[in-house]
Amino acid sequence: NSEYPELFGREWENYCRTDSNPELKGNLWAPDVIYNEKMGKYCMYMSVNGDDWNSVIVMLTADSIEGPYEYGGPVVYSGFDAGDKHPAELTDVYQVLGEGADLTRYQSTTNTKLNAIDPCVTYDEEGNLWMVFGSWFGGIYLLKLDEETGLRDYATTYETVPNQSDAYYGYKLAGGCSVSGEGPFIIYKDGYYYLFLSYGGLVAEGGYQIRIFRSENITGPYVDEAGNSAVYTSQENNLFTNIGVRIMGSYDWSGNRETRVAQGHNSAYVSEDGEIYMVYHSRFAEGKNGITEAHEVRVQQLFVNEAGWLVAAPYEYTGEHISKTGYDMEQMCGEYEFIIHTPTTYYQKAGKATVGIMQPSHITLNENGSVTGELTGSWTYEEGSPNMTITLDGVTYQGVFLKMPSEKLYFNQKEREVVMTFTVLGNNVTAWGSK
């Protein structure tokens, strides 16, 4: 539906619009669509962005996923205060908290001030409908929705407990204390809810990066492989942190056409046959077609290692499937480029493909189980399965082998070369190998 001034005009004109940000165009962000079984409708959740965190997430409905969509109502607001600048009376905050409630904490970026954008709506394993949302500063939160309306479930209440929950925003899942973090997304697989977050800024040198945490409950707590909480209790620059499993870093190796940087703001999908796909956008150190900030959408398959953590295929998805019965010794053995996705650095120099870029080491997986080359150690595999374990310089990584096409076409090639790869995680750090 191209009539977005009519669809979103009510919230935009009444709450989000300011003299410094007067146009709705360019202020509609990050839609998320889900089929609501109770309503029998496709529900789109859209961020309507205003200045100074003065934003609202609204819901639209349609009978077809392609639309046309109709306005359903607001779900959650941010940026409100008790004064005249962003009047709370224009929101539902007093309906939730009660008339005269103290709103002081919602104006503190180290406390609960966040931007109500970037919704992800999902069902838990018990059939309850939830929305995870938020951006930077105050953190990422989770609200229960009413399946009958697709909007906030006003019958569900929350306590205000520092670093755990807020009476208006719901359960606190991640972030806080002014750290970066946006684009939350949750999927469920084999007993765990996986929370994806993007740290940093989305420009090429902004340190954009995807981090993963998991929990046995959709409401948390979410932790990384090392047991670190996704919630921050003190202020720090989390672009250089080892908190959260960084699914991939900025990297350059022979299997890619360009140097990948600033990957982020992903969604993810678990197919009916149990395969997992991650959709995200990437920028490039060299730019693309003369555009420094050019970006493209990518899809990469994810796998669950033996410890129950997600690891990403080294190359973009082109229809290949992992061998559930594994691979033979000749396919697995040989020389590999090996990249460690160090979580504490990122690309920071336009046009220079060496600053903050992960470069490969060269290793050889030998038939006797040893690893030789620039790094040394050992490796094993699970008979009848793609699962593998590799120990290098004292760090043990677990993951899978996968035979797939690389992303680089060499001179006179019409098809990408199919190569053996592996993707692993160990000591809270991901790594890839490509033969």
Where are the language model's segments positioned?
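Carbohydrate-active catalytic/glycan-binding domains of CAZyme proteins
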Residues: 1-435
